[in-house]
């Protein structure tokens, strides 16, 4: 075969999620979309906030096309990065600046550049807690590392710390956490994050090298009934936050998100530069320019107040 076998396999065989999505479209054509309940892709059924369309309208009317559609800085427009930092600082009492952010084509790109930046050997490992988004394995392996899966406590899908500690080795580069979790919906409490931080601090010292938390957070705002989703960087210094606006602003097809590299990260400027280099090597330079401007205007809005009535109707 004159093409890469692993890439051929990925391209010729859909994931189970994609298979279900395509099957759902086929069934909708037969029985009507209103009769098909699609639990495959995370496509929101709630429209984007009015701010999104209003901002797009204003941008197309007031900006020239070169300014609107041209390249931004590789790491993203500084005004957008600062707007995100200001919002997070106000909301979570963090202390980020624009320089902590690298804007990406969504959380998938964020994770991919982090895996590429941190992987230095084919023996390197990233751990995740089951159940998990199946593309984690694709992203990790495509960037030259191995994915290690740790089973959760099956009663509540929380972290089994005994199993996690056994899984950590001298090759562990990071632990991927996804809270609120896709697909279980589990949320890790502050106490859980603190316990995870203590374990990784201990293991980092034993290994003589930092073990990172990669906090995959596209569902951060989708937590109900007063459930708190702790901001992980406040509890563990070596945390890289991978975020997408796909869910919070109902923009999955626009591919816009970011990586945060806090100043507290070990050799943070080196890590940031490696992430920027990974973005360059993987072709993820310059997130969609118009939607960078949309995010600057709409940052902080969430669909939770819109989707809550739908949720209540579904569970009543």
Regions found by a protein language model. Name each.
Residues 2, 6-106, 298-300:
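N-terminal small-domain helix-loop-helix segment of the aminotransferase-like
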Residues 26-33, 63, 91-93, 119-121, ...:
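Alpha-helix termini
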Residues 45-49, 183-186, 221-222, 250-252:
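Short catalytic/ligand-binding loop motif for oxyanion handling, primarily in non-cytosolic enzymes
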Residues 65-208, 220-235, 240:
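Conserved core of the PLP fold type I
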Residues 213-214:
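Residue-level marker for buried hydrophobic side chains located in beta-strands
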Residues 217:
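Walker B catalytic acidic pair
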Residues 237-307:
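Conserved core segment of the aminotransferase class I/II
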Residues 308-310, 315:
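Positively charged, low-complexity/disordered segments
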């Amino acid at each position: 075969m004159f093409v890469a076998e692993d890439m051929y396999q990925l391209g010729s065989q859909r994931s189970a999620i994609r298979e279900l999505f395509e099957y759902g479209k086929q069934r909708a054509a037969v029985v009507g979309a209103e009769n098909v309940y699609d639990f495959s892709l995370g496509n929101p059924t709630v429209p984007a906030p009015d701010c999104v369309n209003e901002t797009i309208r204003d941008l197309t009317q007031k900006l020239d096309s070169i300014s609107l559609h041209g390249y931004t800085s590789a790491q993203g427009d500084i005004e957008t990065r600062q707007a995100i930092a200001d919002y997070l600082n106000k909301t979570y009492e963090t202390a980020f600046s624009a320089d902590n952010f690298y804007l990406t084509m969504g959380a998938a790109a964020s994770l991919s550049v982090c895996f590429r930046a941190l992987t230095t050997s084919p023996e390197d490992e990233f751990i995740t807690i089951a159940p998990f988004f199946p593309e984690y394995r694709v992203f990790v392996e495509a960037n030259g590392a191995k994915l290690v899966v740790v089973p959760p406590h099956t009663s509540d899908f929380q972290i089994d710390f005994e199993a996690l500690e056994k899984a950590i080795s001298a090759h562990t580069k990071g632990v991927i956490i996804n809270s609120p979790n896709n697909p279980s919906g589990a949320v890790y409490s502050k106490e859980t994050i603190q316990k995870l931080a203590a374990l990784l601090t201990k293991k980092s010292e034993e290994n003589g090298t930092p073990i990172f938390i990669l906090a995959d957070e596209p569902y951060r705002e989708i937590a109900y009934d007063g459930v708190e989703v702790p901001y992980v960087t406040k509890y563990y210094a070596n945390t890289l936050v991978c975020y997408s606006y796909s869910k919070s602003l109902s923009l999955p097809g626009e591919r816009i998100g970011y990586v945060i590299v806090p100043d507290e990260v070990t050799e943070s400027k080196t890590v940031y530069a490696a992430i920027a280099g990974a973005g360059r090597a993987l072709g993820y330079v310059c997130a969609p320019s118009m939607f960078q401007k949309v995010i600057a205007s709409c940052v902080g809005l969430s669909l939770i107040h819109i989707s809550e009535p739908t949720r209540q109707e579904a569970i009543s």
